[in-house]
Amino acid sequence: MASELQRPDSMPCHNRQVNSTSSPSPEHLLAEDRVLDHAEENNAAMAKLTLLPGHAHSSVLSERDSPACCSTNLHSENHSDSSDSGNYDAPVGGDSLLGDCELSRQIGAQLKLLPMNDQIRELQTIIRDKTASRGDFMFSADRLIRLVVEEGLNQLPYKECMVTTPTGHKYEGVKFEKGNCGVSIMRSGEAMEQGLRDCCRSIRIGKILIQSDEETQRAKVYYAKFPPDIHRRKVLLMYPILSTGNTVIEAVKVLIEHGVQPSVIILLSLFSTPHGAKSIIQEFPEITILTTEVHPVAPTHFGQKYFGTD
């Protein structure tokens, strides 16, 4: 009997551990409460963050944590500077990425970004890759241009219409409102013309040539030809790379001289710097800019490589 009464004291130690865990001490409970409270505070803070749709690398707006937001963007900018060397891409200083909270507030809804996904990211990577062949470069550029043009068409007005199907049924749909045209800023803007024609076969396209004056180094208009009724049309202005924004600003001024209002101009671009986008919006607050990426390093080699003159 004595040996049987002693058995409970000689049970394996892991049973005693389970028993101690099932009856936590008051100090342990207080520690768990502190962890849960901390997690709830973090969740509440995260609930105040708003991401632009599809852009994990883009704007992060916070009601109370803007310094943290901006520090993240500065890290991204430093990383990009270390990964791009030489004059292949031209950095434009003065601003960080679009993720900079203050820049996002300044530009606002007039700057529209394509929803980011791996397909677009790969196309951007190939276009920026110094070792990419011209064939791969053009193929990727044309694909990205097509995506930008398709999204640009979504910004144009539609109207409801009724059609009859081959089986005799009525179908309520939509169609473009008349009065749209494209304008390419030569010469890199001409790379986007085919993408627009692939989507709108009969659209009219004008051209404008702007270059820097050799003496004054200021943007100067050398050639401009538009549809005669452009003042009554909505304009898709095509220019793939926004670096300083000066060329686009000059082009918009010419369009205004021909009776076009900035509010009906949609600028289609592949890449933009923060400085370029902000300069255009500050000059013309009503214009709409559509691009795939806002980054301080602009691939200014685009036109030369696309047309084989690099």
Swiss-Prot record:
GO biological process: female pregnancy; lactation; response to insulin; UMP biosynthetic process
Residues with the Phosphoserine modification: 25
Binding positions (uracil): 300-302
InterPro entries hit by this protein: PRibTrfase_dom, PRTase-like
GO molecular function, one term: GTP binding
Pfam families linked to this entry: UPRTase
UniProt: GTP binding residues: 134, 143, 177-180, 204, 233
Subcellular location: Cytoplasm; Nucleus
Segments of skewed composition (Polar residues): 16-25
Binding of 5-phospho-alpha-D-ribose 1-diphosphate, residues: 187, 239-247
Protein name (Swiss-Prot/TrEMBL): Uracil phosphoribosyltransferase homolog
UniProt organism field: Mus musculus (Mouse)
Gene name of this polypeptide: Uprt
